[in-house]
Each structure stands twice: as C-alpha cells, then as structure tokens.
C-alpha cells in the first residue's frame, strides 16, 4: 500500500512525463508547487517507488520514467476526469447533429476528428450490417432509366446505390414495389433480406406489379449490400510524431500493422463494458507493446454495435482521451436511437 506522499510523487512523475516525454528527477519534482518535501525525502520515496516497480531508470538519464505497472496504477487509482474545452464539445456535438444519421459517414468523420484532437491514431469499427434490421427503403427516380435506391437500417446505416430501371417498369410499379417492401420487410434483419424477398415478397409483388420479371431482376441488385463491418482510421502516421517512435526500426512493425488494418478487426470485435485501457504488453500484439489502446463501445440497449479506440504511446494523455471517448460514444449511441 502506497503512502499519501508516495501517491503524490508517483502521480506528479507520471503527469510530468506525459507532458514532457523527459525522465523526471528529484530536482524537477522539488520545483513543483504541490511537492513540499525536501530533496532527500523525494529521493528516498523515488527509490522506494522504483523498488516497488512503479518507476524505472532509463539508460540515458538519471531521472525516472513510469513503468507499465506505474501506468496501470495511475489509470486505475489516480486518474481524474478531464473537462474538455467547450469548443471541442461543440465540434463533436455538431458532427452528430445531422438530420439524417448516417452511421458509416459519422464513423469515418469520428476517426478523423479524434485523431486531430489527440494527435494519436484513432480507429472506429462501424456497425455490423448483418445484425441491423431494415427500417425503410426508398427508390428515387433520377430519369427514365435510372434511380437511386436508399436503404436505411435501425442503427442509422444508410446505403445508397444507383440502379438501372428496366424500360418495362414504370413509375407506378416502382411506387407499388416500395410500398410492399416497406410493409413486409421493415424490421427484418439485413442478413435475411435476400432470402425473404425471393421466398415471400416475389409472390406478393406478382399481384401488384405489371412487369414482374423485370422488377424482380432490379430488386436482386438493389439488396446486395456488404454485411460485414467496416473499419476507419484517422491519423495513421501520427505515431511518428511521438518522441518514442522516432526510431523507424522500432516502429516499423506497428506501422505495418496499422497499414494492413485487418488485425484490428479481431482486437476491436471483443465484447466489453465501458472504457477499456490496455497498456504496453497487456496488448496481445507484440507490435503494440510500447503502446496503449483505449477503447469504448457504442450500443443500443444490450446490443454492442461498434467500437471507438485510440492508439498512442504508453505516455498517453489518459484522462483527456477517456473523456473524449466517453463523449463520442454517448453521442454515437444517442444518434443511433434517433
């Protein structure tokens, strides 16, 4: 159990190192207003903290830096919530204020904004469409030969595609088709749509649409949408701006992993509750052993729909990143309920 004095010194060391990226010595601590102990006392307490494994020496300096154990203790016991600047809160809320909530568009923009606000790498795993349910479908004619089919799901995903309208299908046929589709398919899971259409809906449409065969061929292409989730990155190269990663050899495997993207699907797909912080070697990938990954999920009720994560050095601004993720996931979840 750490004493109050040790807790204060440990927190001050970590806060200072997060801001400066420079090892922290007793002289630096002695200049802090909140540290009122003698230099000898500070040195003794630092020696005890080092012996306990919370801080460690570096090869190039007499100062100390936090260990993974130190960061873990800091995150679990010493971290205080950080109030975000009002301008950032407004910027984030504006992103989610669109009248039509397009989940994939928001996911992509969220990754970009988060990377800019943190100068770390942001990763957003979009909703998996196979678990979405159809909310409604629209077919909007552009001219006599083409139309735009708009598919909206219960999670706010909007899929639009341009389709060719056969000459034998007129506007009244299109209108009848849309009415039947919305009446019969609203609430049906996206992964079941294709079978539902060709096992049940085609029979219903036969009684409504004059040019039945042409209309069915058009529908076949309309509902072929990708069902797997998409992953969006913001600030892929941001890690290179961190002092820890100026050695390109050290960071090469991490950059390769970020560039390939696929490995992050497995990392972000896991079920979790609330904010999760993985520090250094707590990450399963060896490429991330000098990094911290903070992730949070957005959901509707009990259903987890996607994940937002920030990847940065272990010397990460944990409090700020957690506050940002809490705001983003809250806004994302509220947007999906619209």
Curated annotation (Swiss-Prot):
GO biological process, one term: negative regulation of DNA-templated transcription
Keywords associated with the record: Repressor, Stress response, Transcription, Transcription regulation
Highest taxon above the source species: Bacteria
InterPro entries associated with the record: GAF-like_dom_sf, HrcA, HrcA_C, WH-like_DNA-bd_sf, WH_DNA-bd_sf, WHTH_transcript_rep_HrcA_IDD
Gene Ontology molecular function: any one: DNA binding
Pfam families given in the database record: HrcA
Function as written in the Swiss-Prot or TrEMBL entry: Negative regulator of class I heat shock genes (grpE-dnaK-dnaJ and groELS operons). Prevents heat-shock induction of these operons.
Homology family: Belongs to the HrcA family.
Protein name (record): Heat-inducible transcription repressor HrcA
Primary gene name: hrcA
């Amino acid at each position: 159990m750490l004493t109050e004095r040790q807790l204060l010194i440990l927190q001050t060391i970590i806060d200072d190192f997060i801001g400066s990226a420079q090892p922290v010595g007793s002289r630096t601590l002695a200049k802090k207003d909140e540290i009122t102990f003698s230099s000898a006392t500070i040195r003794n307490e630092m020696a005890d903290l080092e012996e306990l494994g919370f801080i460690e020496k570096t090869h190039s300096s007499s100062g100390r830096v936090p260990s993974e154990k130190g960061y873990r203790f800091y995150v679990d016991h010493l971290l205080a919530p950080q109030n975000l600047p009002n301008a950032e809160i407004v910027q984030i809320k504006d992103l989610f204020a669109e009248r039509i909530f397009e989940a994939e568009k928001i996911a992509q923009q969220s990754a970009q904004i988060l990377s800019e606000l943190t100068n770390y790498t942001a990763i957003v795993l979009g909703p998996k469409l196979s678990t979405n349910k159809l909310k409604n479908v629209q077919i909007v004619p552009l001219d006599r030969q083409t139309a735009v089919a708009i598919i909206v799901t219960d999670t706010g995903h909007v899929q639009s595609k341009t389709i060719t309208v056969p000459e034998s299908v007129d506007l009244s046929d299109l209108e009848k088709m849309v009415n039947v589709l919305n009446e019969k398919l609203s609430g049906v899971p996206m992964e079941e749509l294709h079978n539902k259409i060709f096992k049940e809906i085609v029979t219903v449409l036969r009684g409504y649409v004059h040019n039945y065969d042409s209309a069915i061929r058009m529908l076949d292409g309309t509902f072929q949408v990708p069902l797997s989730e998409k992953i969006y990155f913001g600030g892929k190269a941001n890690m290179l701006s961190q002092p820890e990663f100026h050695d390109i050899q050290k960071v090469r495997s991490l950059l390769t992993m970020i560039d390939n993207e696929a490995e992050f699907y497995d990392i972000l797909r896991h079920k979790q509750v609330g904010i999760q912080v993985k520090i250094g070697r707590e990450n399963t990938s060896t490429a991330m052993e000098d990094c911290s990954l903070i992730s949070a999920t957005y959901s509707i009720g009990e259903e987890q729909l996607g994940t937002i994560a920030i990847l940065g050095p272990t010397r990460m601004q944990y409090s700020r990143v957690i506050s940002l993720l809490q705001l983003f996931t809250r806004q994302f979840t509220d947007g999906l309920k619209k």
